[in-house]
Amino acid sequence: MDATELKLVLDDHVLWLSNVGGKRADLREADLRGVNLGGADLRRADLRRADLGGADLDFSCLPLWCGGLNFKIDEKIAKQLMYHVLNLMIYSEIEIPTTPQTLVEFANRIHRSDVEMLSLKGV
């Protein structure tokens, strides 16, 4: 997907989010490595199996639904996401799991029953 096509998809997505036409962004399996998505509103966009390695996600909005699972990120994005999660947990006085296993167990207590449980198998 080139920059022009991506801009059209994101512009249509904003219209769709505002209920004034457009359509939901379908970015499944998209190669978005190194793309500047800063400020992009990706709520409810489908990012499954997309590759966002090296993408700039500053001031963007990632979806918190199943379409926002199973896409690739790089270490920079992982650190940024982890920073935000830990900041909110500390601020909210939520106990932070201290081992990878207890972290997975904590995450698997998600309020949804229709998502696949996480596992450290193969890590």
Outline where the language-model segments fall.
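Intrinsic low-complexity/IDR segments
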Residues: 1-33, 38, 43-44, 48-123
